[in-house]
Amino acid sequence: VKEIFGKTVDTGLKHGTVTIIKHGSGYEVTTYRIDGEYLDGRHPETVEFTPDLREDLKRRDFTINAMAYSHETGIVDEFEGMEDLKRRVIRCVGCAKDRFTEDALRILRAVRFAAQLDFVIEDETYKAIAEIAPNLVHVSKERIQVELTKLLLSDHPEKIWMVDATGIEEYVTPGFTEVFERELESRNSMDPLKECWAGIAALPADKSHRWAGFLRHMTAEQAVKILRGLKLDNDTIGNVKNMIMAFQAPLAVDKVEIRGLLSRVTEYQFLGAMQLKKLDGDETVPGILRLFEEIKEAGDCVSLKQLAVNGGDLLAKGLEKGKQIGDGLMYLLNLVLEKPELNKKDILLEKINQFKEK
């Protein structure tokens, strides 16, 4: 392949894979191979190349992924993958327990594919997931997180309930089982988990909204612990933390309270929290959003950046650098959050005198 095509990248020569670069796009080409033993529950110890396509296909995870195509011979489907596609079924190639024992990540992939494609998991494959679930200890938290995130970003994020139903949840990260336990305790319906996450699909399909939707009934601190355990990026963790905090904070249809909340979270996080409230049937959301738009239109100050004075102004008024200036700015911000009309430089400089006298 490297001789035939001028520009290639050695993406995995050990496994017989090179990437052809053509017209600015990359195309992976992999030699047929047979995997050796999986001693670590994730990767084969050895790889043996083979000219036999069937040998390559039978090492695949699921039948729908074990098909090949040639313009000369058409579809090669040794394991009835096309039939499973038609039936909308996730089924392992060969013995499901063997496939999951070889690579425990396949357990999460089965659940994720079922969610993404809105398929069902075949009975033997489902039983094997529950039996081999303890092997997930061999899978890195990053890889587990990637699969769960893909599931939550799919068209059927509500199928996260399958993580509990298959017994996977206790091997995800500390605290993860509590997410499901809390929902089971708080709901009396026949299908509490399915009911709880039924509306997540209505949230924007990004990591922050979907993870916040899933974790919204945990405390913000518990959510952070779970997400850090799964090695999510700091931006997502920060967004989820503040969305949940704002979602759970008591909030009246009142401009002072809304401005106060906006001073602690970003607009993106605030709107995300409102979507979480709406998800749980909070009838105050329309009124809150109406006042939020009025606050925006009026240009009300909700942050230190919007204050009509800055640290330099307070320094000139005789406040000491550091904590005193910081406390002074927060004092003024709190005044302005309650009465936006006070956000004028001369008024605030007069008000800071009251702060100095305290």
Task: Identify what each model region corresponds to.
Residues 1-358:
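Catalytic cores of the polymerase beta-like nucleotidyltransferase superfamily
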